[in-house]
Amino acid sequence: MSVKFQEEATRSIRADTKELAHKVGERLTGGNAQTGYLALYLRQLQSNPLRTKMLTSGLLSGLQEVLASWIANDVSKHGHYFSARVPKMTLYGMFISAPLGHLLVGILQKVFAGRTSLKAKILQILASNLIVSPIQNAVYLMSMAIIAGARTLHQVRATVKAGFMPVMKVSWITSPLALAFAQKFLPEHTWVPFFNIIGFFIGTYVNTHTKKKRLEALRKVQSTSRTK
């Protein structure tokens, strides 16, 4: 009797779990009724493209800073990972990164609208890597320099000069793959958020690496000062 009750309870739990997973998936993807969060987001992306991209980019940029600080164990002077850089990164994502991406990717899509040949797709990838990416990366590095405390043109220029080619090398590896995927599988109005997500992971990696190097250099300076 006890074994039978246990089996029935197990089946009931499995059924409830399956139903819950189904409902969560339906809410996320929209299911057949198109009422999920993804469907709602895509509708907002079509009806209010720039606003939706600004909110998406701002959220991802702020989250990127918090996540990179957590991975690198870079705590603020108050002992937590939410530093003054987080709201600055959020503002950068909303008012610089998103509008710039909206403009540049929009131009790229208009130039190649209706052109689906292999040659056109290759040209679009080349234009993205040789025109769009350099502009976005230069603006990104200038913004990061200012957020980090650069106040003179020389400081900003030095930051861009030092970081431009390393960032471009990462872009030249990831951008063709991301754009080829977008060309094949995604509607054009979802491209900018998709690239924002790709940029989120790349930016988190670069930001984490930079923080770790800075903390390591700081520890070396502190260790040297103690031995003197």
UniProtKB/Swiss-Prot annotation:
Keywords: Membrane, Peroxisome, Transmembrane, Transmembrane helix. InterPro entries: Mpv17_PMP22. The chain crosses the membrane at residues 89-109, 130-150, 162-182, 185-205. It is a multi-pass membrane protein. GO terms for cellular component: cell septum; cytoplasm; peroxisomal membrane; Woronin body. It is found in: Peroxisome membrane; Cell septum. Belongs to the peroxisomal membrane protein PXMP2/4 family. Woronin sorting complex protein involved in both Woronin bodies (WB) formation and inherence. Localizes to large peroxisome membranes where it self-assembles into detergent-resistant oligomers that envelop hex-1 assemblies, producing asymmetrical nascent WBs. These structures are then delivered to the cell cortex, which permits partitioning of the nascent WB and WB inheritance. Self-assembles into detergent-resistant oligomers and forms a complex with hexA assemblies. This is Woronin body membrane protein wscA. It comes from Aspergillus fumigatus (strain ATCC MYA-4609 / CBS 101355 / FGSC A1100 / Af293) (Neosartorya fumigata).
